[in-house]
Amino acid sequence: MTNKLTPKEKDFYYKSIIPIADEARKEFMGDYEPINNSFETIEQLGFLVLRFPSRGDSDLSGFFMRKSKNNCIYINTNQTLGRQFTSIWHEYYHYYTNDGQGLSYVSKVTTDPSEFKADTFAGCILMPEKIVKQYIEINNILLNRISYIELIKMQNYFRVSLAALLVRLIQIYPNEKDVLQQRFAITKNNLNAITRLQNYTMQANGDTRLIQPTNEVYIPESFYDNLENNLNNNRISKEKAYELLKVIEELFNATE
């Protein structure tokens, strides 16, 4: 059985990730801008993003691969949209730092240093400390008695899962850990917790897509349009076009 990372190890890795995430974020976002659509942002950074349900292990969150000079990210849509947004920045970490490789599994975040750092990086990208503190100040939130409604509104602002938000708040406000840990109760994978989370989300006028698997299949039309256009204009050979289509096939096969 693999040992879980200790609190001391997590704190060490977290502190090492902060400057890396801050530097990475400056390249594509303003200091006080939340990321409204992580998929679009990653595509604008030049990545081929494919999203579809894993035909294998539901614990698979995604993976990054370089193929035929293309940077490709696969995201498993069997998971909630909030988790998918974390997963795509998790994979961006593997690209950006070259730390870790292969398939990413949610369960490994607590045991594997590279996976923990990748999830921590994603949290820092999606919820930078300065924006979190600004949000809490503007909305007059008292963390020692924060309500589920306040948390869900905050979750929707940052476009993350509730669990990811709570993890990030504990990182930024360790003195409020005891109270915040109690709020994990409605993030559990059981009927009572799921029902409560859905009810609170509707009360807060939140986006229920963030708390549900989307199970969508997404391959950008631009991929096929660009491929056809380049082929018709003799910018690439038939062999190259076939090679690119094989990339798609390999991504599908890797999720089985």
Language-model region placement:
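Active-site hotspot residues in diverse enzymes, especially metal/ion-binding acidic/histidine motifs
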Residues: 1-256
